[in-house]
Design a protein with these regions (language model features):
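Metal-dependent polysaccharide deacetylase catalytic core of the NodB/CE4 family, i.e.
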Residues: 99-101, 111-113, 117-118, 122-237, ...
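N-terminal pre-catalytic segment of deacetylase/amide-hydrolase enzymes
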Residues: 2-104, 110-116, 123
Length: 245
C-alpha cells in the first residue's frame, strides 16, 4: 500500500525494461494504461524472523460446497478463524445482508480466454478481480491495461507463484513487492489485494501478508475450469456454479 512503512531490508526491484507483446517499447515515464507511474514503496514485513513462532504449517485451502443458498460450514469457519485471529483475509462476506457475488479469477498464464471474459463483463456491466502473476502481466500488457482501464481489480498473485508457507517472511515480502513494483512502474496502478498461489497458506504467511497492508482473498465457490478432464460443456459449468450459490 502507499502508506507502507520503510524498511532497510533488500527488496526486489522491477525489471528495467518490460517484455513487450505490442507495438514500440514504452518511452520513459509512459505506462500501458496512460496513467502516470506511481512511486515505488518500501515494504516492511513485521517480525521478519518470526520470533513469535507463528505456525508455518502449510494448509491447502478448502471451502466446501454450498447448498440451498447457504455457504458450507467450512467456508464459514474459515472466515471466523481469520477474524478471530486478526488476519486480514476474506473468503466470505459476513457483513452484507444482500446476496452478493464477488467474481475473482486467477491469472497465472494466458490461454486465450481472458479477453472473452472481459468482453462479457463489459457487456453485462460487471467488474471483477483478476489475480495475476508477474509473467502474466509482462507477457500480456494490453490485457492487463484493459482490466485496469475498465475498472477491474488487478490483484497480486506473486512474482514466481511459489508456495508461500515454504518461504521466509522476507521472501514473501519480496514476491509481493516485485509484482507491485512492476504494476506501479508500467501501469501506474496498485491494489492491496493478494491471493496465495495454489491457495497454500500458513498462519505466519497470513500474518506476513497482512503486515504489508494486503488483504488475502480466498473463495467460497469455485469451478475446476483449470482441469481439462472435467469439462462437460458450458451448460454443465453454468448449472454447477449456480447450484453452489
Amino acid at each position: 500500500s502507499e502508506t507502507a512503512a520503510p524498511t532497510t531490508e533488500s527488496t526486489t526491484a522491477p525489471d528495467p525494461k518490460p517484455v513487450l507483446s505490442g507495438d514500440a517499447a514504452l518511452k520513459d515515464g509512459e505506462t500501458y494504461t496512460g496513467r502516470a507511474p506511481l512511486p515505488l514503496v518500501d515494504f516492511n514485513v513485521s517480525d521478519p524472523e518470526n520470533t513469535r513462532g507463528l505456525s508455518t504449517e502449510k494448509h491447502g485451502y478448502g471451502y466446501g460446497i454450498a447448498k440451498d443458498g447457504k455457504p458450507n460450514d467450512i467456508s464459514v469457519n474459515n472466515q471466523k478463524y481469520f477474524e478471530t485471529n486478526g488476519y486480514k483475509a476474506l473468503c466470505l462476506d459476513t457483513k452484507s445482508t444482500d446476496k452478493v457475488l464477488y467474481l475473482t479469477f486467477d491469472c497465472g498464464y494466458e490461454n486465450g480466454y481472458t479477453a472473452k471474459i472481459l468482453d462479457t463483463l463489459k457487456e453485462k456491466q460487471v467488474t471483477a478481480a483478476f489475480f495475476c502473476t508477474l509473467p502474466q502481466v509482462k507477457e500480456n500488457p494490453e490485457i492487463i491495461a484493459r482490466m485496469i482501464n475498465e475498472d477491474h481489480i488487478v490483484g497480486n498473485h506473486s512474482v514466481t507463484h511459489p508456495s508461500f508457507p515454504t518461504l521466509t517472511r522476507l521472501q514473501m515480502a519480496n514476491e509481493i513487492k516485485g509484482m507491485d513494483d512492476y504494476l506501479r512502474t508500467y501501469f501506474g496502478y496498485s491494489a492491496p489485494f493478494f491471493r496465495f498461489p495454489m491457495g497454500e497458506y500458513s498462519d505466519s504467511a497470513l500474518d506476513a501478508v497482512g503486515s504489508l497492508g494486503y488483504t488475502s482473498v480466498f473463495w467460497s465457490v469455485a469451478y475446476s475450469d483449470w482441469d481439462l478432464k472435467k469439462q462437460k460443456g458450458e451448460e454443465f459449468a453454468f448449472n454447477t456454479v449456480m447450484s453452489r450459490l
